[in-house]
UniProtKB/Swiss-Prot annotation:
Keywords, comma-separated and alphabetical: Ribonucleoprotein, Ribosomal protein
Full protein name: Large ribosomal subunit protein eL34
Entry's Gene Ontology molecular function annotations: structural constituent of ribosome
Pfam families, per the entry: Ribosomal_L34e (PF01199)
Family label: Belongs to the eukaryotic ribosomal protein eL34 family.
One of the GO biological process terms: translation
Lineage top rank: taxon: Archaea
Annotated GO CC locations: ribonucleoprotein complex; ribosome
HAMAP family: Ribosomal_eL34
InterPro entries recorded: Ribosomal_eL34, Ribosomal_eL34_C_sf, Ribosomal_eL34_CS, Ribosomal_L34e_arc-type
Amino acid sequence: MPRPALRSRSLRRIYVKLPSGKTAIHYERKKNDIPKCAMCKKPLHGVKTNFLHKYGKSEKRPERPFGGYLCSSCLAQLIKAMVRQ
């Protein structure tokens, strides 16, 4: 049985075939998915994905309205639509 730290599902399991023919399990951190815009689903620029605890709040996402939620082009469309109403 693996040690308790490796039983967590926050680590991904990679099954590796050894030269002897046996299968070993290697553990590594999961990679986070790229954040996407809520409207157009394009990848967001300027948003970090992994190890967010290492960064300050301003480094994790853009400092603008809806930063980290909408891309800049969708935000421009939204602002124009709100102004025109």
